[in-house]
Amino acid sequence: MKLSRRSFMKANAVAAAAAAAGLSVPGVARAVVGQQEAIKWDKAPCRFCGTGCGVLVGTQQGRVVACQGDPDAPVNRGLNCIKGYFLPKIMYGKDRLTQPMLRMKDGKYHKDGEFTPVSWDQAFDVMEEKFKTSLKEKGPEAIGMFGSGQWTIWEGYAAAKLFKAGFRSNNIDPNARHCMASAVVGFMRTFGMDEPMGCYDDIEQADAFVLWGSNMAEMHPILWSRITNRRLSDPNVKVAVLSTFQHRSFELADNGIVFTPQSDLMILNYIANYIIQHDAVNQDFFTKHVNLRKGATDIGYGLRPTHPLEKAAKNPGSDASGPMSFDEYKAFVAEYTLDKTAAMTGVPKDQLEQLAQLYADPNKRVISYWTMGFNQHTRGVWANNLVYNLHLLTGKISQPGCGPFSLTGQPSACGTAREVGTFSHRLPADMVVTNEKHRDICEKHWQIPAGTIPAKVGLHAVAQDRALKDGKLNVYWVMCNNNMQAGPNINEDRMPGWRDPRNFIIVSDPYPTVSALSADLILPTAMWVEKEGAYGNAERRTQFWRQQIKAPGEAKSDLWQLVQFSRRFKTEEVWPEALLAQKPELRGKTLYDVLFATPAVSKFPLSELKEDQLNDESRELGFYLQKGLFEEYAWFGRGHGHDLAPFDDYHNARGLRWPVVDGKETQWRYSEGNDPYVKAGEGYKFYGKPDGKAVIFALPFEPAAESPDNEYDLWLSTGRVLEHWHTGSMTRRVPELHRAFPEAVVFIHPLDAKARDLRRGDKVKVSSRRGEVISFVETRGRNRPPQGLVYMPFFDAAQLVNNLTLDATDPLSKETDFKKCAVKLAKV
């Protein structure tokens, strides 16, 4: 068989990338070379992080046999990271679940029974009985769902609609609560709208990059490759990296800064002070487009109300703020002097000054990037607000090459969790359940009775754990996440609730994860291109893909599970008489009829699918379900700055960045000439706010919820590594990735190890006030903590690092701080 030069180059690029990581590529590069003519190719976004890389998926005989970077994808331009090259193998683990499994004893469900295969009807029978019993005895607050930033857009939309409109319960929250909630609240407080104003095209036009708590080299490697290219192509481009420990991103840094945990708040206020003291405020921009407010302080740590820290807080959970003058703000940040900041953070003065100069220089276009170091923080919302302050003071925002940019960890934390509104307090397009007008908009569009959607905010992720433990939440459906491994404080606040006989736990997953094995019912789930899907990435880019193969055995998509389960409930079983009296025509109808088989959703016929196009859900129902749900959902944002393109446009494009108006996507929001919502002559308009002005907040440094002491003498920070994604439920089933990083380790400074008589490779017990884990000492390698801090990745199911972590959260966003708790080490 003849092979074109282009195909040869592609195949070798795949092999070279894997070889660089010390990995082999069986079935990937060889499949491209040896079987190219027999393979059918189609596009899809990558299954992993929020970068949103485009890939070409090769299928043959009903299996994914190859994957390569899509050269036409604007995000990654044909390049994949090492996880992306091994995408096919995530679906073919030997322990893939293919049928529902229920805990049974003596032929019926039992909390302490053994997992036994059952049919879908049997699984839904038990679920139906548990849901109906809890709804009847305790009401909608007794049921809940924990979803995902890995849901497709229509899966998240269907879940939110089923729970908030169908079951009348706002107890639905995504695992994005653990990673992006602080970014959401930060955006909403400062700009009145969620998500970044810039895009990845900023990278090629920036003069400086500042990373705040973000190891892009490992967590967003494709974007890092673009930053690296920009930095190495121009000696005047600068990179600053801030973290509580050194990591691979420091290798490119001109200014690598290691600071004391939690003290990033001080650094941010110091830079604001520097900008003012050096007359670097962009007065024209500031005067026209910015307001100043002083936020409430001493707001607690999101712990249980009985916790001493919550009792001691003066304003627990307060989001209050009041107006202030520029002189008052100037006086506020003046306290954050160079001397004080250096002393409190442990950062040398010259490094602090170099960092501040990047922001203050009017001729430097600066991008600030951050991820979990900022967001997983008991003052994560404040950290987000404070970095916006720097860009608003200098006017370095909403223009090519400059702006603040919150990077996303999951493939659709933006497109699904945030935009769709699967958080316990949100509705589509930045609307919230507490706003009567917003509820009314949803109820009218969904054609359900007024008052159907509850006005009370539902339980967020950590509150769900506590409610399960307390017996207040009794039926809990977990989809597309592994929270028993990923969530905080497993021993004290999660496992007790899951194994409580009063509660019934359902987990939908492709694999027997820690969460699945802790549940009462496991539902086998279709993965990635085994279903039609859509994700929204960090730069507001919405991307579609088609179903390309069938799921194994009886595995079904999350969308199928949600829609089919809705058939089990009639309106009179879930809605009070007062609601039904408003719309008597809905009596006797199922939630499927009312929510998913409506004229608005079911109006797109199967004829819109190609004859040979797979779409299991739609072909079973008799209409194009995904298109109906998407178009119904997209209505919420059109004309309101969240405009999505028509459904069919996305199948013909490599994604489009919203707002999409008149067929044109938006690269930079809020600025004239870039954003269709900013009129000629306005310059800038932050139209999420009533007056079109963004807000600078005065917010102080406040300490962490838990710090080292004489007994627990080390900080613990948790996170990820390049080779594995989150809890490793997919990547650890890829042999090459597993071999590259087979088990978690404790990264520790050599002097801390020596002081404890520990050597590299030693087995060590890591203990906190909440639990312990056995791991292995690592004094070398990619992560280099300072003395007094250890770092552990959480991908290893054999080392449940979250037995150690504290369930403290940001009181405003309810996001957990996984970066700061106190531990001690002991040689085993």
UniProtKB/Swiss-Prot annotation:
Q: Does the keyword Hydrolase apply?
A: no
How is this chain modified after translation? Predicted to be exported by the Tat system. The position of the signal peptide cleavage has not been experimentally proven.
Instruction: Tell me the ranges covered by the 4Fe-4S Mo/W bis-MGD-type domain, including all copies.
Output: 39-95
Record: residues binding Mo-bis(molybdopterin guanine dinucleotide): 83, 150, 175, 179, 212-219, 243-247, 262-264, 372, 376, 482, 508-509, 531, 558, 718-727, 802, 819
Please name the InterPro entries in this protein's record.
Asp_de-COase-like_dom_sf (IPR009010), CT_Nitrate-R-NapA-like (IPR041957), MoPterin_dinucl-bd_dom (IPR006657), Mopterin_OxRdtase (IPR006656), Mopterin_OxRdtase_4Fe-4S_dom (IPR006963), MopterinOxRdtase_cofactor_BS (IPR027467), Periplasm_NO3_reductase_lsu (IPR010051), Prok_molybdopt-oxidoreductase (IPR050123)
Q: How is the cofactor bound?
A: Binds 1 [4Fe-4S] cluster.
Q: Does the keyword Protein biosynthesis apply?
A: no
Q: A Pfam family name for this chain?
A: Molybdopterin
Q: Which cofactor does it need?
A: [4Fe-4S] cluster; Mo-bis(molybdopterin guanine dinucleotide)
- This enzyme's EC code(s): 1.9.6.1
Q: Could you provide one GO biological process annotation from this protein's UniProt record?
A: nitrate assimilation
Signal peptide as annotated in the record: 1-31
Instruction: Please give the GO cellular component terms listed in this UniProt entry.
Output: membrane; nitrate reductase complex; periplasmic space
**Binding annotation for [4Fe-4S] cluster:** 46, 49, 53, 81
- The UniProt entry lists the main location of this chain as periplasm
Q: Where does substrate bind?
A: 794
The places in or outside the cell where this protein is found are: Periplasm
| MF terms (GO), sorted A to Z | 4 iron, 4 sulfur cluster binding; electron transfer activity; iron ion binding; molybdenum ion binding; molybdopterin cofactor binding; nitrate reductase (cytochrome) activity
Q: Which UniProt keywords apply?
A: 4Fe-4S, Electron transport, Iron, Iron-sulfur, Metal-binding, Molybdenum, Nitrate assimilation, Oxidoreductase, Periplasm, Signal, Transport
What chemistry does it catalyse, as a reaction equation? 2 Fe(II)-[cytochrome] + nitrate + 2 H(+) = 2 Fe(III)-[cytochrome] + nitrite + H2O
User: What the protein does?
Assistant: Catalytic subunit of the periplasmic nitrate reductase complex NapAB. Receives electrons from NapB and catalyzes the reduction of nitrate to nitrite.
Q: HAMAP family from the entry?
A: Nitrate_reduct_NapA
> Belongs to which family?
Belongs to the prokaryotic molybdopterin-containing oxidoreductase family. NasA/NapA/NarB subfamily.
Quaternary structure and interacting proteins, as annotated = Component of the periplasmic nitrate reductase NapAB complex composed of NapA and NapB.
Extract the NCBIfam families matched here: NAPA, PRK13532.1, TAT_signal_seq
Q: What is this protein called?
A: Periplasmic nitrate reductase
- Species of origin reads Salmonella arizonae (strain ATCC BAA-731 / CDC346-86 / RSK2980)
Q: What is the lineage of its organism?
A: Bacteria, Pseudomonadati, Pseudomonadota, Gammaproteobacteria, Enterobacterales
